[in-house]
Swiss-Prot record:
The lineage of its organism: Bacteria, Pseudomonadati, Pseudomonadota, Gammaproteobacteria, Vibrionales. Gene3D superfamilies: ATP-grasp fold, B domain (3.30.470.20), Phosphorylase Kinase, domain 1 (3.30.200.20). Pathway: Purine metabolism; IMP biosynthesis via de novo pathway; 5-amino-1-(5-phospho-D-ribosyl)imidazole-4-carboxamide from 5-amino-1-(5-phospho-D-ribosyl)imidazole-4-carboxylate: step 1/2. This is Phosphoribosylaminoimidazole-succinocarboxamide synthase. It comes from Aliivibrio fischeri (strain ATCC 700601 / ES114). Signal peptide: none annotated. Its EC number is 6.3.2.6. It comes from the Bacteria. Belongs to the SAICAR synthetase family. The gene is purC.
Length: 367
């Protein structure tokens, strides 16, 4: 079995029964179930949702996205071995810990396979809920260029790279391109202030203005739970991105929940504590891969400048990355997942065949 066989690169061509187009994102694909199948599964599996709640199958891939591009490696390697299973395992672990600590629910109802979630359809809040405990990444780059105002927050002078901030900073951005909002540019992932959100809460899909404080509370609480757990395994939770949405429970009550993934190496920066104390940064997240790309290509501005997207897409399409870099990233994902969950990630020989088998035999979702 070759490495490329073990990688699930294409995840939007599964024969899952659906009557809607498959939504294919950078990493995950979503198959909306028919109304009949949704009702049947809710009844058969006893999911705690309304009887008519729309359900979906969410399938993660092993594709690697960075700087808004999908990258590939030598030997026709179209993804990172173990990445999808590692990300799902980490999210599953944190969502369970959130539940144990009395935080909000997630959109996940069932986990048929390490690559698969059965989820309840949610109305997404159109915000990338980002928070930062250290100054690094894009915030540091902006700071070195003289910027001191960040999402309406004024940063103090004389901060140093990778320094711990005095408090957890909430630095939200838009989820996608939002149009017709005063003071918010119509570009992807643009930073916004709390006042932007307050003045336009309905356009960000909040049901009421009070829910802004609720999302902030859930963001801070979720960050604290993960940071505490990571501290126990000598890891630092540097910064992260959460996403939120609304669902209805079995009684028809609307509630704000966590959705997408949480606390993963894709959505967060995680540093090794011992290395940080000795003045070094060891990345246990995708950030190490981003740094590799910036050093690998002679003109890193292509990866950072949003006005050069066509060049960037060509760079990703035309360049097979060294196998060593792909496998180093695989080890990062597998190692941090094992540390967080306490169990090793088992690589599948043929994930696509396994997914089809379980959805056909145990869920009757494949004809």
């Amino acid at each position: 079995m070759s490495l490329s066989d073990q990688v699930l690169a294409v995840n939007d061509d599964l024969p899952i029964r659906t009557d809607k187009p498959v939504h294919s994102g950078k990493v995950r694909s979503v198959y909306w179930l028919t109304e009949e199948d949704s009702r049947r599964l809710i009844k058969e599996k006893g999911y705690n949702v309304a009887p008519d709640a729309p359900l979906a199958i969410m399938v993660i891939s092993d594709r690697i996205s960075a700087f808004d591009c999908i990258w590939h490696g030598e030997g026709d390697l179209k993804g990172i071995p173990g990445k999808g299973a590692a990300l799902n395992a980490i999210s599953n672990h944190w969502f369970q810990l959130f539940k144990d600590n009395g935080l909000a629910d997630s959109h996940i109802l069932d986990i048929p396979h390490p690559f698969v979630w059965i989820v309840q359809k949610a109305k997404p809040v159109m915000i990338e809920a980002i928070c930062r405990q250290y100054i690094t990444g894009s915030m540091w780059r902006a700071y070195t260029q003289g910027e001191r105002e960040f999402c309406g927050i004024t940063l103090p002078e004389r901060l140093e790279k990778d320094e711990q901030l005095a408090e957890l900073l909430l630095t939200p951005s838009t989820k996608g391109i939002l149009k017709g909002i005063d003071g918010v540019p119509e570009v992807d992932d643009v930073n916004i202030t709390r006042k932007n959100i307050e003045d336009n809460y309905d356009k960000f899909n909040f049901s009421c203005i009070e829910d802004i404080a609720t999302y902030e509370k859930l963001l801070k609480e979720g960050f604290a739970v993960i940071a505490k757990a990571l501290n126990k395994i000598d890891q630092i939770f540097v910064d992260t991105k959460f996403e939120f949405g609304y669902v209805e429970d079995a009684q028809g009550n609307e509630k704000l929940i966590y959705m997408d993934e949480v606390g993963t190496p894709d959505s967060s920066r995680i540093w090794d504590t011992k290395a940080y104390r000795s003045g070094h940064i060891i990345e246990n997240s995708k950030e190490g891969f981003r740094q590799f790309l910036l050093n690998h290509f002679p003109e890193p501005d292509i990866l950072l400048n949003k006005n050069r997207m066509e060049e960037r897409f060509a760079l990703a399409e035309e360049n097979a990355l060294p196998l060593e870099a792909m496998m180093d990233l695989s080890k990062t994902y597998l190692d941090i997942a094992a540390k967080i969950t306490g169990a090793p990630i088992t690589l599948s020989d043929n994930p696509k065949a396994e997914i089809i088998k379980v959805l056909k035999e145990e869920y009757q979702l494949v004809d």
